[in-house]
Amino acid sequence: MPFTLGQRWISDTESELGLGTVVAVNTRMITLLFPASGENRLYSRSDAPITRVMFNPGDTVTSHEGWQLKIDDVREEKGLLVYCGQRLDDETPAELREVFLDSKLTFNKPQDRLFAGQIDRMDRFALRYRARKHQNEQALQQWGGLRGMRASLIPHQLHIAYEVGQRHAPRVLLADEVGLGKTIEAGMIIHQQLLAGRASRVLIVVPETLQHQWLVEMLRRFNLLFSLFDDERYAEAKLDSSNPFETEQLVICSLGFVQRSAQRFAQLVNTDWDLLVVDEAHHLVWSEESPSPEYQAIEALARATPAVLLLTATPEQLGQQSHFARLRLLDPNRFHDYQEFVAEQQQYRPVADAVTLLLAGEKAQAAELNVLSDLLGEQDIEPLLKSINSDSDDNQKARQELITMLMDRHGTSRVLFRNTRQGVKGFPQRVLHQIRLPLPAQYQTAIKVSGIMNANKPLETRARDMLYPEQIYQQLEGDDATWWNFDPRVEWLLNYLTTNRDEKVLVICAQAATALQLEQVLRTREAIRAAVFHEGLSILERDRAAAYFASEEEGAQVLICSEIGSEGRNFQFASHLVMFDLPFNPDLLEQRIGRLDRIGQAKEIQVLVPYLENTAQALLVRWYHEGLDAFEHTCPTGRTIYDAHHAQLIERLTTVGEQQGLDEFIHTCRQQHDSLKQQLEQGRDRLLEMHSNGGEQAQLLAQAIAEQDNDVNLVTFALNLFDIVGINQEDRSDNLIILTPSDHMLVPDFPGLPQDGCTITFDRDQALSREDAQFISWEHPLIRNGLDLVLSGDTGSCAVSLLKNKALPVGTLLAELVYVVEAQAPKHLQLTRFLPPTPVRLLMDRKGTNLAAQVEFESFNRQLNAVNRHTSSKLVNAVQSDVHAMLQQAEALVETQARQLITEAQQQADLQLRRELERLEALKAVNPNIREDELTALENQREQVLSNLHEANWRLDAIRLVVVTHQ
């Protein structure tokens, strides 16, 4: 091609230089100036890796002065192009010589990039098309936010999360019994709300001791990186913003931190949170006359935040007044009068009794049939009532239908979810082993001396000290005191571990110092492999320790945890728990056993308690076991009895030698425990349990998600993505892959990939047993960021390939076109449920025939060969006019398909949202817990969704030219 001064060209190999201008030409060489980058390049005339930039009628170009021109015609004058058309700013006719084009011009349309020589690799085109297809398929899945969590698929948890996560601004109480996974349920709801765009700012308020547990759980299980706000972090953020809380989207803080400063609290309330989560909400004290400051603080936050999740103990444990106080935070208009609430609850008793009757499968008596008729009076249920007393096949179906109707009328079932272990099932037995050991003389002396020296300390402090004789001894003898040389618990532990070499054993003690000293003794005396877990370790260090313990090959036999260090970690792959000492209250005891006693635990849990006779430990073992039955069963009454007998218990712990009346004390506690437990059992609300555990629907949901695990398409796509992005992959045993950044990645920092790399697995069970392995799903940030990286930029948007096929004439030209049909709308409308960005593939020949239906993408792609960029540019220049004609023919074809997709999406959205609205309106007639704002929001959402779908459009997303060759 002849070169003329002033012509505009673009570099095939350095497109980032911008638009170049020919500034010098001689017989062998040409010089290009790239004004945007200030660079010069010298090229050989005969084989320069550059492409002439030529625009066509219909294109819009920008001048060096900034104004834009819509091109109507192009003419050539002395080797230079002149673009004629209309200016967009003042709509006047204008001409623009190519020398005056803006040098920073970028080519966004695939066809522009193709004609400008910015041609990508063939494998990137294939990756882009696959990314479009997978993104479309995943958007249509109805369980978004539930599949990617690093947790077992427990039906009742999935049911609650799905039920609540789908709502507009959910305001609910999660009150499952301990060990049933309230934190995971909350995490799934948060994850769903964030992915769906219903929430973007989340505040979690927890007791100070649980901050790190939540931080770890959200990161490890859901890949949600929360910021922990304490005094130090607050002071730092204050330098960047007048309201420090606006510097982060996802925040965790403690209730104490919230309350310590009026200014800070005001800033927190004035931040636009979308979702508020409050853990341990039962500690918020309320009475009609004097609500506590903590309660009032959360009340103010709940009033200012659209969505609220309260995590709390079960209503039966709390008592009705405390339960009402929680509900009042969620909906003060609905729950405004306590006496009215009590009366209303009494009315639900017959509903719950009716459900119990139907569940039992027994025939209903006349009085019971009358109760059912009264409860469901506005509907014709006569045929159903006849069926439940017949022996017909419809009996069970009729019972289920009546239960569903009753559930709709249940007062608080939309705002309260509560599962019990009894209702959920699947928990292991706990077996207690008490190991009584003699009290060493050294400890006897230390305890006596400590009692004299610390006589002025508060009684509770002295009682706590008495539980840890090794700490007392060390305080008296100094840091060099080697208590482990004479403490019989250490000798017993060594023998136990050497005898049970094949068992994974979790050892928990109160203090980090004790944990570290025990690890040293095990290592030096018996070469026992042990990992240590304490509050002084970072999250990453704890992950490594937990992974070392979890590993079957060369892993640690024992993990030694401090009380605080073990919070929020579960090790259900182990079944042996050694309590080297005992915690001070029953909640902490349950928390310790709860590390192993989870759903998914396959074996009986062996709870081993070595204790020293004639000490506070010995007394506490008896009280926990004989008084509360807290070792072998969960103890919902523990806190109530502990609070009632707190003073007497403390006194007995500090005066171990004088234990008159101990048997009576323990007997009294046991009687109260049995009585309270019986009351709780009688108060069980079977209807609420049914609603909360989801029944058969929950089982089907878990099954459906499990079937998507180990998705072969995900594995293939992910490995292909990592290859093309340039991420190093190293296969390890046990389905593990190590990913590390390389020096030649598409982007310098791939979002979600740490600088030092990470270990991944596609296997859920493997991820659960390996704390250091990330569980890769379609919802994982590595995959979502990878999809965004490919689809939001130009990666793979144009390519050229050769097809070796002797059945076709040489030079046959095909254009593979990928259009995207999409609607632009705010994320919270979730338009992707109905019309996610949808790829439409056409395969055009020169005659305008679409061959896509006959030629499947993957098989076609396997037959193609790559072409280098320079040759590709020459091919494109040779067939440019043909490609323009093919694109025009394709426009008419794609319009038909696109309009059909848009119409179907509109119909589906209208039907689904109308049904949802009608269901809620029908429920509102019989259940006052349907909030008016929910109905209004749903109606508004329907109108906005349909309006935005009406505006949906389509565009060319990628183009690949295919030329037939016989060589």
UniProtKB/Swiss-Prot annotation:
UniProt signal peptide: none
Enzyme Commission number(s): 3.6.4.-
Domain of life: Bacteria
Domain Helicase ATP-binding as annotated: residue spans: 163-333
HAMAP family registered for this protein in UniProt: Helicase_RapA (MF_01821)
Role summary: Transcription regulator that activates transcription by stimulating RNA polymerase (RNAP) recycling in case of stress conditions such as supercoiled DNA or high salt concentrations. Probably acts by releasing the RNAP, when it is trapped or immobilized on tightly supercoiled DNA. Does not activate transcription on linear DNA. Probably not involved in DNA repair.
Entries under InterPro entries matching the protein: Helicase_ATP-bd, Helicase_C-like, Helicase_RapA, P-loop_NTPase, RapA_C, SNF2-like_sf, SNF2/RAD54-like_C, SNF2_N
The species this protein was found in: Pectobacterium atrosepticum (strain SCRI 1043 / ATCC BAA-672)
Gene designation per UniProt: rapA
Protein's name according to its UniProt entry: RNA polymerase-associated protein RapA
List of residues binding ATP: D176, E177, V178, G179, L180, G181, K182, T183
Alphabetized GO MF terms: ATP binding; DNA binding; helicase activity; hydrolase activity, acting on acid anhydrides
